[in-house]
Amino acid sequence: MRKDLIELDGSEGGGQILRSALSLSMTSGQPLRIRNIRGRRSRPGLLRQHLTAVRAAAEICAAEVEGAELGSRELAFRPGAIRAGDYAFAIGSAGSCSLVLQTLLPALLAANGESRVRISGGTHNPLAPPADFLRDSWLPLLQRMGAEVDLELLRHGFVPAGGGELLARVRPARWRPLQLEHPGAALRRQARALLAGIPGHVGERELERVRQRLGWSDEERQLEFLAEVQGPGNALLLRIDCEHICATFCAFGQAGVSAERVAEQVATQAIGWMESGCAADEHLADQLLLPMALAGAGSFTTPRLSAHLQSNRRVIERFLPVRIGDQALDGGGHRIVITSA
């Protein structure tokens, strides 16, 4: 694979461009330069979560890095050889552990031995996939594609306190293609209201609204109290296990937002996905594109194309010899198809 310098404009997207570019630079060996990082955001440049991802990526592949500073709007990253090992990274805030781990996994799956990665920060952050999504929805699909990863949620961490912790065990693997046309029949459903230092009636009201909107039984709805020291925090998670996929939807309690409104948000997400008949919801689609591209082929259906998916597609096609196509479905939605370029 060529080792030409890849130059990207980071102004058109947020941290997604940075994370995908780091993953691809590590796995392909191609040096990277990003300008205007998060240029259109209210707080442009690298935040703590992004900086942790950069420094972690650099440690794993012995990269030469310029611009790895808080607030930096330009980054140069020249990767070396990927090294298996026992790693620990602390974000130092409630920044997302999930997003940092997703940045590192493709490289560690290409390493020369087994690795352990411990990441501390936010495990349940409204601006990122919760750890439950990684464990229950995303990683099982990667495992079907050949990835060998085990993930433990050691401690929950909510915004703004953080303090959560994930532990991943990663073994070298070879990617293989995956096709996801539809979810298949629903097999199991579960709603969980997580409460850490939050009154129990908040979760009870959330679960009652889930019953009203979705008709889920008492056995399918669960109140889960976490240690107060892990809070304050509240998340409502819906999990739908189907024949071919497990879908996870999440909404977070926030000041000024009623418990009923939180439940409405997550129920609306789930209903929209179920009615679409597509395999991957919008957020899962964002996260599937890169591993499928690394496999060199694959396809999935999704109800709509997010801005994240569109910008991610452009970054991937700069690094890898793949073509990512979009086919409109007759009943609505899209089929994303990855083929060799």
UniProtKB/Swiss-Prot annotation:
Keyword DNA-binding found: no
Chemical reaction(s) catalysed: a 3'-end 3'-phospho-ribonucleotide-RNA + ATP = a 3'-end 2',3'-cyclophospho-ribonucleotide-RNA + AMP + diphosphate
Active-site annotation: H308 (tele-amp-histidine intermediate)
InterPro entries: RNA3'-term_phos_cycl_insert, RNA3'_phos_cyclase_dom, RNA3'_phos_cyclase_dom_sf, RNA3'_term_phos_cyc, RNA3'_term_phos_cyc_type_1, RNA3'_term_phos_cycl-like_CS, RNA3'P_cycl/enolpyr_Trfase_a/b, RPTC_insert
GO MF annotation list: ATP binding; RNA-3'-phosphate cyclase activity
Native organism taxonomy: Bacteria, Pseudomonadati, Pseudomonadota, Gammaproteobacteria, Pseudomonadales
Residues annotated as binding ATP: Q102, H283, L284, A285, D286, Q287
Gene Ontology cellular component terms for the protein in this record: cytoplasm
Predominant location category: cytoplasm
Keywords associated with the record: ATP-binding, Cytoplasm, Ligase, Nucleotide-binding
Annotated family: Belongs to the RNA 3'-terminal cyclase family. Type 1 subfamily.
Organism superkingdom: Bacteria
GO-annotated biological processes: RNA processing
Function of the protein: Catalyzes the conversion of 3'-phosphate to a 2',3'-cyclic phosphodiester at the end of RNA. The mechanism of action of the enzyme occurs in 3 steps: (A) adenylation of the enzyme by ATP; (B) transfer of adenylate to an RNA-N3'P to produce RNA-N3'PP5'A; (C) and attack of the adjacent 2'-hydroxyl on the 3'-phosphorus in the diester linkage to produce the cyclic end product. The biological role of this enzyme is unknown but it is likely to function in some aspects of cellular RNA processing.
EC number: 6.5.1.4
PROSITE patterns, sorted: RTC (PS01287)
SUPFAM superfamilies: EPT/RTPC-like, RNA 3'-terminal phosphate cyclase, RPTC, insert domain
Naturally occurring in which organism (per UniProt): Pseudomonas aeruginosa (strain LESB58)
Locations listed in the record: Cytoplasm
Protein name from the UniProt record: RNA 3'-terminal phosphate cyclase
Pfam families on file: RTC (PF01137), RTC_insert (PF05189)
Underlying gene: rtcA
